[in-house]
Every structure is written in structure tokens, then in C-alpha cells.
């Protein structure tokens, strides 16, 4: 689906929370490709350099982006939107693959799913950590590349055309523009997204 070529999070050598590093990852075209889709899983393949600690319980903190491009005209902190969640693992001189879905990393998956389905293409790494004068913060990480692969289905319904059932995509007119409908059905009193 898309790749990004590097981002940092955390603090180094006496950094205050206000100067904690911000990593911006732009996945060109992801927003347009995923808008209105029903995402089933998101796989992140993350390559990290040997920065910070080699802990296997390091946390990457993923946030929404306030800009859907790399905006070099603003401070890094201005790029940081709402926190979506964390991913725990070893992010030190390695490549690791993490799959997010409804049963694995469910909270982060739900947040990223909604974010990408809304047409967004940029992820931000930011944890607001501070550091001592001589070292790294506990979750300092430098991601040198990140690739996302997304499994999704189109938002479709079935309609009857004479005696034949056909798969249909439903659209409606909103303020002069066509918008795709996301279908739901009622199951025992609860609305379930198709």
C-alpha cells in the first residue's frame, strides 16, 4: 500500500518534553486508495536503526497528523494530532512485522482503521518523553523505513435485478458531491458494519 523512509520519536541528551522528537511518515496515495473501504487488517513492516535501547518492550506511539503532507514550514509539534495508540516490540537494529486487526492490537487497529478509511495518508510518531543529559529516553527509536500493507473489502450491498442478485456500491449526493455509503445491518438490536 505504501512506504515511508524514516522517522524518530523520543528524546536524547537533556531534551525536554517540548522538544521531544516528532517523526512524520507519509504514505503517498494511501488516503485516496483506502477512503470508504472496509479495512480488515493492517500490517506494518518497520525497520529501525540502532538508536536508543535494544529493549524488546519498546513502545512506538502512533498519532494522527494535523497535515496530510510533510509540512516543513511548521514546528514538528504542530504536526502531532490525536494519539491513536502504541505498538510494543523491539525497534532496534532490526526489521519487525506487526499485524493489526480486530483481535490483535485491537485498539490501535480500530483507531488506524477509522483514520485510513477517512482518507488520511500520514502517521506521526510522538511520545513526549524527556531524557537525561547523557542518554536516550526509554522509548527513543529511529524508524528508517515503514511499509504498510492493508487488507480491505469494498463497501458493497447486494440488490435484486429481476431474478438476479448483483453486487452494488451505494452512493448518495452530499453538498453537490457524490459520497460512498458504508452499509450496516441490524443483528439482534445492534448495528453492524458490513
Stretch-by-stretch model annotation:
Residues 1-50:
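A short beta-strand-loop element at or near the start of a globular domain
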Residues 2, 27, 47, 60-69, ...:
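Predominantly extracellular/luminal cell-surface or secreted proteins
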Residues 18, 52-54, 69-71, 128-142, ...:
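Short, surface-exposed beta-strand/loop "edge" segments at domain boundaries and coil↔beta transitions
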Residues 19, 110-155:
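Proprotein-processing/basic-patch segments
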Residues 24-27, 39-46, 60-63, 98-100, ...:
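Hydrophobic beta-strand residues in large extracellular and virion-surface proteins
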Residues 29-33, 47-51, 65-68, 103, ...:
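Generic structural motif
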Residues 48-121, 139:
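Beta-strand-rich interaction/scaffold domains
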Residues 152-194:
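Intrinsically disordered, compositionally biased repeat/linker segments
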Amino acid at each position: 500500500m505504501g512506504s515511508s523512509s524514516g522517522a524518530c520519536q523520543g528524546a536524547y541528551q537533556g531534551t525536554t518534553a517540548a522538544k521531544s522528537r516528532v517523526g512524520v511518515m507519509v504514505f503517498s496515495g494511501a488516503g485516496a486508495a483506502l477512503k470508504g473501504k472496509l479495512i480488515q487488517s493492517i500490517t506494518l513492516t518497520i525497520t529501525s536503526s540502532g538508536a536508543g535501547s535494544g529493549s524488546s518492550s519498546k513502545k512506538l506511539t502512533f498519532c494522527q497528523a494535523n497535515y496530510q503532507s510533510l509540512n516543513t514550514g511548521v514546528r514538528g509539534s504542530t504536526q502531532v494530532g490525536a494519539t491513536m495508540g502504541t505498538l510494543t516490540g523491539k525497534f532496534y537494529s532490526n526489521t519487525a512485522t506487526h499485524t493489526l486487526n480486530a483481535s490483535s492490537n485491537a485498539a490501535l487497529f480500530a483507531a488506524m482503521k477509522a483514520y485510513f478509511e477517512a482518507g488520511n495518508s500520514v502517521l506521526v510518531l510522538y511520545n513526549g518523553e524527556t531524557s537525561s543529559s547523557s542518554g536516550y529516553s526509554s522509548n527513543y527509536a529511529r524508524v528508517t523505513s515503514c511499509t504498510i500493507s492493508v487488507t480491505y473489502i469494498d463497501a458493497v450491498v447486494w440488490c435484486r435485478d429481476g431474478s438476479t442478485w448483483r453486487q452494488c456500491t451505494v452512493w448518495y449526493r452530499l453538498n453537490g458531491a457524490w459520497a460512498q455509503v458504508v452499509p450496516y445491518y441490524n443483528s439482534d438490536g445492534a448495528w453492524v458494519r458490513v
